[in-house]
Amino acid sequence: TEQNRTEQNRTEQNRTEQNRTEQNRTDEIKLLQYVFGYAVVQLGDVATKIYRGSGITREQVTTDGISCVRYGEIYTTYGVWFDKCKSHTQISEIANPKYFEHGDILFAITGERVEDIAKSTAYVGNEKCLAGGDIVVLKHNQNPKYLAYALSTHNAQKQKSKGKIKSKVVHSSVPAISEITIPLPPLSEQERIVKILDRFDSLCNDISSGLPAEIEARKKQYEYYRDKLLSFPHCS
């Protein structure tokens, strides 16, 4: 019908306009990277897709089946990045499955502490896995470990915690995560930074069985150099 054709044309126009806007922003980021060596971007600018996971209850976790992550595990089990899921579930039990795959960033958007809310981790494994409820999945075309390291800095955590009120349960959201800003250098520089931080992270883990004071000192040293490495000129 004429109404359907009009609606279809409007949808196509909106899609074309959205693609043009995204391309303009991509070109702007590349220009800033070329001139200054990096661009300060919002996560919404680098996201190709961002969405929430779907609830997986404790009772639905099994010893086999499809790999999955529940939001609490982002706080307790996974570090800056991980390549294997701890939990599994039966896909037939999940009414509206939401998937994540290699390179995606996962955020836990419910927590108990303002200081920890929206903790994130990069998945660098090769399985297609399920994201549980209260998780936000961010897809992108950047180096996943770089984004994960940048999102673990004190500056990023301040942004995640901004405006949150202390209570028994703290929440974040897709819009709040989309507004987080990070410095974004070209992919080649992202890779160089990741290699340095991976080596440093490995050194810290090597002494994890040492004296508590030594472990704490090395952890603070790592955090200092991580934040220093990810602090670009005029970027606060």
Question: What are the roles of these predicted feature ranges?
Answer:
Residues 3-26:
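Long, intrinsically disordered low-complexity tandem-repeat segments
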Residues 128-134, 165-186:
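A short glycine-rich beta-alpha junction/loop motif
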